[in-house]
């Protein structure tokens, strides 16, 4: 059995965390084991399930919290366990911190994978500077260069490393996300939404995801359709700001902050539209899960990669059109039916986003020398 040390799990059950869990559920765990390096001493998302699937988790102090402790604990971990791992796989949205790869090289791990999950800087200006600096040197420390999309590859790589880039699809378990009418009815009944138009968004409450604009769009839509609600599933730094803005717009009774939810299938099933006005994305797992559920999706044009579109009831729309135009498009999209699961399953397989077929490809890449 080969063991791979994986970095990318945090306390927040976001897109990268879902991506890693999906693949670990479906690789042949008799051939390969994932161990997870977590830069927090708190439990990370899905940790109990990962452990139940045979993974190990190693917790160290984050560099941001204490750089000296981070460096010491990282070296101690590799000194103790480095000989067990045939590869290190680093899943990140920025190259600001490449110490994991440097340390892996120092301890003789031959296969060192960097995997890009974003297409723009989501962090501070300083981390943006560090990203562009490390972009020049990443070829010195990594041996394999992966990305979730062509845009994400260009954000991380240049020249020779870009030519070597391999696109790894953010494949999902399509059956696990399929529309469930019983779960739809249960959630809508529990919240008193039986006769309401439910517009939803799933993701980290963060500048990148542009939920503030979603509130502006919903304000326009709600004026014309008062029997509607906007639901945010997720948590993040912007939650208080968004809650205050909803109040200022007079929408407190019509905007729901559902927090972290583990049955995403049920929440997607309760939606009539998935509203996704992100400012930038790598290749959104949330948008893929929404399409597996069949719910109509309205997403940012020129921001979210074209390859995200699987279903016919997925529409791109330019953010520059403004909230009123988005509101009219929202009204149009809510009149469109869900896609049938048979068609969805076939399209996901054809485009390489069905985890049942993609997990074997990833396993082969991880095990290749």
Language-model region placement:
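N-terminal strand-loop element at the rim of the active site
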Residues: 6-14, 18-73, 77, 237-239, ...
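A conserved mid-protein helix/loop that constitutes part of the nucleotide-sugar donor-binding site
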Residues: 14-22, 197, 201-220, 237-243
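A charged, aromatic-enriched C-terminal amphipathic alpha-helix characteristic of glycosyltransferases
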Residues: 15, 337-369
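Acidic anion/phosphate-binding donor-loop and adjacent secondary structure
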Residues: 65-69, 154-158, 169-190, 195, ...
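Aromatic "clamp/platform" in nucleotide-sugar-dependent glycosyltransferases that forms part
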Residues: 93, 260, 279
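Active-site donor-binding acidic/aromatic loop of nucleotide-activated sugar
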Residues: 230, 238-241, 252-261, 267
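Short hydrophobic beta-strand element within catalytic cores of glycosyltransferases
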Residues: 296-301, 306
